[in-house]
Design a protein with these regions (language model features):
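Nucleotide-sugar donor-binding catalytic core of glycosyltransferases
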Residues: 1-55, 59, 75-79, 122-137
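Short low-complexity, flexible loop/linker segments enriched in glycine and/or proline
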Residues: 12-16, 64, 87-90
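Pol beta-like nucleotidyltransferase catalytic core
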Residues: 21-25, 67, 71-137
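Conserved donor-binding/catalytic loop of nucleotide-activated donor transferases
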Residues: 42-44, 64-69
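A short acidic (Asp/Glu
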Residues: 59-62, 84-85
Length: 137
């Protein structure tokens, strides 16, 4: 598990009874480099995303998981509003009572349309941003 800082780790450990018995060695405090992250996605079938409770938008992990064509389990219910949402590939669980049906993990990833993948490529995002700008000259 990753924490942005040791201070956050200790704060969460004090606040969350489930972390009280955890060892600091079980956590990372530096982000993975690009190659390590890609290798981790390559080896994974399913990715878990636990977003901040007040966050409504998606984490980068959600976008990366779609791009990696891996299944996603997330605590963010807003993911159901996105065009790439497919209940076969993405499971939004209740933060307080996360239930993951066995069938979700056992079923294969279902491809989504190439057009949807294209919408989330960085070059497409940049084109969308720059095409929407109005230049005064």
């Amino acid at each position: 598990m990753f924490f942005q800082s040791r201070i956050l780790y200790y704060k969460m450990k004090l606040q969350n009874k489930n972390l009280r018995g955890a060892s600091i060695r079980d956590f990372r405090f530096t982000p993975l480099d690009k190659n390590s992250l890609l290798e981790l996605y390559r080896k994974s079938r399913t990715v878990i995303d636990i977003q901040h409770p007040k966050q409504t938008g998606l984490t980068m992990r959600c976008i990366e998981t779609v791009g990696a064509k891996r299944k996603l389990i997330t605590t963010n219910p807003h993911i159901k509003e996105y065009d790439f949402y497919d209940e076969n590939n993405i499971l939004a669980v209740n933060r307080e009572n996360p239930i993951v049906p066995t069938g979700f993990l056992e079923s294969p990833y279902r491809e989504i349309s190439a057009e949807v993948y294209e919408n989330y490529r960085i070059d497409h995002w940049l084109k969308t941003i720059f095409d929407s700008w109005v230049f005064p000259w």
